[in-house]
Amino acid sequence: MARFRGSITKVSRRLGVALSPKAEKYLEKRPYAPGEHGQSRRGKVSEYALQLREKQKMKYLYGVLEKQFRNYYKKAVSQRGITGDNLVKLLERRFDNVVFRAGFSPSRAGARQLVTHGHLLINGKKVDIPSYLLKPGDAMEFRQKSQNLDAVADSMNRAPDSRIPSWIQVDKAHKKAVFLAVPEREEVQEPFNEQLVVELYSK
């Protein structure tokens, strides 16, 4: 499965948003773009550049490559409601994102690894596809043989409980969670403007 393999810290500095816990620490020390002239870059940013930057933020935050991201956009357009809201809701329903939101991993990249390595079940069945879209009422849990793995315990211990949203019910003691509902747009606190992405794709 294709995924981004470059430096997420450099991308975070370029976009001005932390895309991982490690990148968050770097941004605190160096809150400017990488490179020799990172601190001195000035000038008016074009509308297209702003739109492109917001798209990049969304793609990197959710760990989605261009082709798949565009497919999410097309699906969002075909649904009723506000296209931007629909796009965010689709991304929030991704299996790897829900694992991250539930506090089973400190990062979406880590959550993606847990999923692809087959550690988790959805409604009692193994699902190893990060892009699988959960529905309200879907229950996820770690496989029995994965319950006591050091990697799983470490992943959960490093994920802050304070981040768990109201639309996911979590039982950390038993390593289980239920996806209660698709969140409304205002419930998703992420540093991007999806409307600019809609404007970019609708040209």
UniProtKB/Swiss-Prot annotation:
GO cellular-component term (any):
small ribosomal subunit
Q: Report quaternary structure and partners.
A: Part of the 30S ribosomal subunit. Contacts protein S5. The interaction surface between S4 and S5 is involved in control of translational fidelity.
Record-level Gene Ontology MF annotations: rRNA binding; structural constituent of ribosome
Q: Function, please?
A: One of the primary rRNA binding proteins, it binds directly to 16S rRNA where it nucleates assembly of the body of the 30S subunit.
InterPro entries, per the entry: Ribosomal_uS4 (IPR022801), Ribosomal_uS4_bac-type (IPR005709), Ribosomal_uS4_N (IPR001912), S4_RNA-bd (IPR002942), S4_RNA-bd_sf (IPR036986)
Going by the UniProt record, its keywords in alphabetical order are: Ribonucleoprotein, Ribosomal protein, RNA-binding, rRNA-binding
Keyword Cell wall biogenesis/degradation appears in the UniProt entry: no
Q: Which residues form the S4 RNA-binding domain?
A: 93-153
- The organism's superkingdom is given as Bacteria
- Name it: Small ribosomal subunit protein uS4
> CDD domains this protein is in?
S4 (cd00165)
Q: Which family does it belong to?
A: Belongs to the universal ribosomal protein uS4 family.
Instruction: Cite a single Pfam family from the UniProt record.
Output: S4
One GO term of the biological process aspect: ribosomal small subunit biogenesis
Species the sequence originates in: Chlorobium phaeobacteroides (strain BS1)
